[in-house]
């Protein structure tokens, strides 16, 4: 929490000391996920689809430029609650195209291909282009390959923070708040470096399982793939992902998880109530009570840790999630 407050403070400082030399020159042309956009001025009625997109904009101090947000798996960061309260919420779930258009947007940015793209349940980018509205998709999701039959695709190499920095820099340029963007990026870089230094001597290259959720106790586990943000967290903490699938969000049987025998199990904390095992305490209860799963060494040794579920997505919360797990590892003497 302290690091997030520091991050927010840095952005506030950037408001006071913004360098006019770095101001955006309009028209601004940007390329994003194969699309070229031109902005003649900063958007005034943006719609953020996805929690990460919304929180990036709020951290950049853009609440007055936001017409609405949608799709929130967890509550907003506490230090952003006041700003967020000033922005219309369409829904915490998947919005309709009609509800988005009703806000009269002049820019639509999305976190996930589920919310914007050729296979989206909401809209294709062409739906907005035809109306003269620019759209944007998180670069972290553009980097996945759509070859798995899953909307999130697969990732050929380990995700890293550079893709998040690209997104922050793009948003800062679009809205002409570059100094704030630079402050955010520098804060993240310092925090990642500190974690890597702390866990550089981690012994044994421990394997991590990142369990997001399951529809029911009898269902397979929905987990972070090898090269996903979860894999990045494992890497930062001196280990590796126990899941070898390159799919971004594979569903894996418990038989396969038992065979992988992870050293550490990280369970997602979610505020939504979509699936039976969304809540962290329900996941922990399952791990400890299932006859087979409870025999995993990680379970018997108590190496089960809770992390913000949004951190398992490639978001501004990913590093925060790494910090959460790091604190629990240190408390257990596993760093």
Model-derived features: where do they sit?
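Extracytoplasmic ligand-binding site segments that recognize negatively charged/polar headgroups
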Residues: 115-123, 133-170, 203-229
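Second-shell loop/turn segments in exported
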Residues: 43-44, 86-87, 111-115, 150-158, ...
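A short, structured surface patch at a secondary-structure boundary
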Residues: 48-118
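Short helix-initiation/N-cap motifs at beta->coil->alpha
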Residues: 30-34, 87-98, 246-254
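Solvent-exposed loop/turn segments at secondary-structure junctions
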Residues: 52-56, 72-75, 107-108, 113-118, ...
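Bacterial Sec-exported substrate-binding components of ABC uptake systems
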Residues: 2-6, 18-55, 157, 170-211, ...
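Alpha-helical, coiled-coil/dimerization segments enriched in small aliphatic residues
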Residues: 74-75, 221-249
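Structured C-terminal subdomain patch of bacterial secreted/periplasmic proteins
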Residues: 155-167, 266-335
């Amino acid at each position: 929490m302290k690091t997030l407050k520091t991050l927010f403070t840095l952005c506030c400082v950037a408001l006071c000391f913004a360098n006019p030399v770095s101001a955006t020159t309009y028209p601004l042309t940007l390329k994003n996920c194969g699309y070229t956009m031109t902005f003649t001025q900063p958007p005034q009625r943006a719609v953020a689809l996805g929690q990460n997109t919304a929180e990036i904009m709020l951290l950049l101090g853009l609440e007055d430029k936001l017409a609405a947000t949608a799709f929130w798996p967890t509550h907003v960061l506490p230090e952003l609650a006041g700003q967020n309260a000033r922005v219309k919420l369409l829904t915490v779930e998947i919005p309709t195209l009609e509800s988005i258009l009703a806000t009269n947007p002049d820019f639509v940015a999305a976190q996930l291909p589920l919310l914007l793209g050729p296979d989206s349940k909401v809209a294709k980018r062409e739906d907005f282009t035809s109306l003269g509205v620019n759209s944007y998709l998180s670069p972290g999701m553009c980097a996945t390959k759509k070859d798995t039959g899953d909307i999130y695709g697969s990732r050929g190499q380990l995700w890293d923070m550079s893709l998040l920095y690209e997104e922050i820099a793009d948003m800062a340029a679009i809205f002409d708040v570059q100094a704030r963007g630079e402050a955010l990026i520098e804060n993240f870089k310092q925090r990642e470096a500190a974690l890597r230094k702390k866990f550089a001597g981690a012994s044994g290259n421990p394997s991590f399982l990142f369990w997001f959720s399951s529809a029911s106790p009898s269902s397979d586990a929905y987990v972070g793939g090898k090269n996903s943000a979860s894999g990045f967290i494992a890497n930062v903490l001196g280990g590796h992902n126990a899941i070898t699938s390159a799919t971004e969000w594979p569903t894996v049987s418990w038989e396969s998880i038992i065979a992988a025998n992870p050293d550490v199990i990280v369970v997602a904390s979610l505020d939504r109530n979509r699936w039976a095992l969304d809540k962290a305490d329900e996941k922990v209860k399952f791990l400890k009570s299932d006859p087979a799963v409870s025999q995993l060494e990680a379970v018997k040794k108590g190496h089960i840790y809770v992390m913000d579920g949004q951190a398992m997505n490639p978001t501004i919360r990913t590093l925060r999630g790494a910090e959460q797990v790091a604190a629990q590892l240190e408390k257990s003497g596993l760093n």
